[in-house]
Amino acid sequence: KIPMKKILFIHSFFLVFLGSIFGKKPNILFIMSDDHAAHAISAYGGQLAKIAPTPNLDRLAKEGALFQNAFCTNSICSPSRACVLTGQYNHVNGAVDLGGRVEPGKQMLAIEMGKAGYETAMIGKWHLKVEPKDFNYYCVLPGQGKYHGPSVRIRGDKPWGKNLIDFPEKHSTDAITDLTLNWLKDRKKEKPFFLMHHYK
């Protein structure tokens, strides 16, 4: 068995290696949504492909990468997110239930992508209790967040959790999408980006 941390390192190294071969590192957009099975994305050709097509996600899959052999290490929100972020199983990273947390300094995906020369951002549902401090930029829902009229936490002058932006008239999906589009428009263009875009 290969430890998850090593797999995460190998994947990061592979992306950096590809970038050095072709002279330019690829931008990376990681989209996550809660309870979203692969067969719900028509690019995978599942039973829902004709009933509920996903043409925009299909286009992204065609132009980028489509994981054909990926596994969820935990079936609930916080632990699953912690595994992706740390590259570790939950019994190692400590996030074993919905009260899970990943402390700054252990948010390895953000740290390693930053070391590889990427501008890192986390936008949307975080649900890991503590500040996503290892990202260059973040704009995250507090806890599970609200579906309608959400607030998001941002980095600012006040302590973690006190710097908020409210979206009283929006659904969380629209607010998260708008925040991501604004960040993509305003970000530093001289660096490639690694963006974790998480829906509720």
Label for each model-derived stretch:
Residues 5, 11, 19-200:
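Formylglycine-dependent sulfatase
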